[in-house]
Amino acid sequence: MVSCAGILKKLEIPVHERETLSFLKNPDLLPIKKEKQTWGFFSNFAYWGIISFSVGTWLSASQALSVGLSYPETIGTFIVGDFVTILFTLANSYPGSDWKVGYTLSQRFVFGIYGSYFGILIRVLMSIVNYASNAWLGGLCINMILDSWSHHYLHLKNTLTPSVAMETKEVIGFMLFHVVTVLCYWMKPYQINYILIISCTATCFSMMGMIIYLTHKAGGVGDLFTSTKSTATGSDKSWAWVYMISYWFGSVSPGSVNQSDYSRFGTSKTAIWTGTILALFIPTTLVPVFGVIGASTSVKLYGQELWQPMDIFTYWLKDNYSAGARAGAFFCGLSFTLSQMSYTISNSGFASGMDLAGVLPKYINIKRGAIFTAVISVALQPWNFYNKSSNVFLTVMSSFGIVMTPIIAVMICDNLVIRKRQYSVTEAFKIKGEYYYFKGFNWRAFVAWICGMTPGLPGMAWEVNNKYFNNKGIVNFYYGDSFFSFVISFFLYWILCLVFPYHVKILHDDKDYFGAFSDEEARKKGMVPYSEISEEELDAYNFPSHKTEGFEKETSSIRKQGVVSSSDGHAYEEKDESDHITKQRIVSTKTSSTSDLQEESS
C-alpha cells in the first residue's frame, strides 16, 4: 500500500525544474530586469482592452432593468465607474512602475512577510471565481465555432434534465474551453502581451462588424434606448446609480489589484497611464452600448431580446445557414474565444499560478498552479451565474469589490501617504527585515481591511436572499460599498499608522541589485546603477549576477552548495541573512533600534 509520504514524494516538482528557491524568493518575485520591460502603449491598452472586449462586458447592461434604471442611465453609471476604476488602478500601479515588483511583493510591503499570505489567499480565491465565470462564457464562444462547422451540432438535442441550469452543448463547449486554455499554461507569463494585442484587435473588429450587420439588417439600432424608462425614483434612483457604479468597479477590481503584476513590464509611466486610461474609457463605454444595440435589433429580427452574442449567432445560423453566415459565425466565434481565453489566463490563471508557486514551491510551479485553478473553478458551477437569475450574476460581480476594495485602499494609503512611494525591495526577501512588523504581520493593515469589508457582508447576504431582513441602511451601504469601504479602510489605516507608527529604518535600496533600471534612472532614485555593482557583491547577497546567465545559474550554484528549499520554506543559511542585514547600507534619515525593526514597539 502506497504511503502518504510516497504520494507526496511523487508529486514533488523535480529539483532542476523548480521555479522557486523558497517562499521568500523566486524568479517571478524578483524585479523585472530593464531589458524585459517591453510593454508599451499597445500592450498596456490590450491588457485592459481585453477585459472590455469580452462577452461579460457586452452583456453588462442587461442588468439595468433589475435595478430600475434605463439603458442610457446605465451607460452613464458605467462611465462614472470607469473614472473610479482609473483612479484606483493608476494609484495601485506605482509599486510596479516605481520598483518593478508584482502583487506578491506589494503584499509583503503592506501586510508583512507572513501577513502577505492573506493577500495571496484572497487573490487565489478571487482568481478561481473569475476563472469560473469567464470559462463558462468562453465555452459558449467555442460553441459558435462548432455551430459554424456542423449543422447537426447547431441543432444538437439537449439530454440533460430541466433541473440543471445548462444544456448538453454548453457542457461540451465549457469542457473544450478548459482544455484549450490549459494548453496556454505551457507558455511563460511574460509572453502573453502579443496574444493580448491580437485578441483585443480581432474582437474589436468582430464586435464592430457584428453591430454594423445587425443595424443594417434591422434598419436601425432599435428602440431599447428610448423605449425603456427608469422605474426607480427619488432616493431609490440615486442608490441604484451608486449600486451600478459599485457593480461596474467590482467586476474589474481583480484587474486593478493585479495592476502591479503588469505595470512592472511597462516601458514608461506614460505608456502605462495612457494605455490604461484610454482602454478604460473608450471600449468599456462602447461595448455595453453594442450589447444594448444587439439586444434591441434582435427584438426586431428574432422576436426577443438576445443579450449574449452567442445567442444572436445561434438565431443567425438557424435563420440562414449559408456559407457567409457560417464564415461570420466562425471568425466572430474565434475572436471571442481568443478574447475570453486571454482574459482568463492573464487575470486568473497566471495570477493564481504565480501565487501558489511562491507558497508551495516544492509541489507547485506556475503551470500546476494555473491548472489547479482551472480544475477547482468547475466546482463553482458558473452556469448558475448566468442561467438562473440576474441577481446571481450581480452578486458574484459585486462581491469582488467588497473583498478587494479595502485591500486596494490599504495598499494605496501605505504607498502614497505613509511611505511616499519608497520601498526597499531587498528587505522583502528577508524574514526579519523592514517588513517583519510584529511577528511578520502588519496588524494595522488587517484591522483596516476587516473594518472596511465587514459592513458590506450583510448587504451581500440580503442580495442572495432578501428574506433574511429588510434594513434599508444596510442595503444602501452595500450598494455604495466600493466608495464606503475604500474611505473606511484608507483613513482607518492612516489613523492607525499615526497613532501606532512603525519605524522605517531603510527607506529604499542603496543599489540596483536586480538591474531593473537604467543607469540614469538608478541615479535619480539615489541608487548605485546595476552596471557598477561587482559580481562578488551580487554573489554575497545571493542575487543573480549580470555576468552569469541569470537566475538559473544562480539556482544551480546554490543547490551545489547544499542550500536548497527545506520543508519549512527557508532557503538561506542564517549567517547569509545576518550578513545581508549587516552589509545593507541604511539610507533613511530616521533612526530606530535593530529590535524595533524585528519586533516593532508600539
Model regions and ranges:
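Intrinsically disordered, low-complexity terminal tails of fungal membrane proteins
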Residues: 1-32, 502-602
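Membrane-interface "cap" regions at the ends of multi-pass membrane proteins
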Residues: 2-71, 86, 207-210, 214-220, ...
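Membrane-water interface regions at transmembrane-helix termini and the short interhelical loops
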Residues: 66-68, 93-95, 110, 118, ...
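Juxtamembrane transmembrane-helix boundary signature
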Residues: 78-111, 120-126, 130-136, 498-501, ...
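Membrane-interface loop-to-helix entry segments
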Residues: 133-139, 172-217, 224-226, 276-280, ...
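Loop-to-transmembrane helix boundary motifs in multi-pass membrane proteins
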Residues: 163-175, 358-387, 434-455
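C-terminal membrane-solvent junction of multi-pass transporters and transport-like membrane proteins
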Residues: 407-491
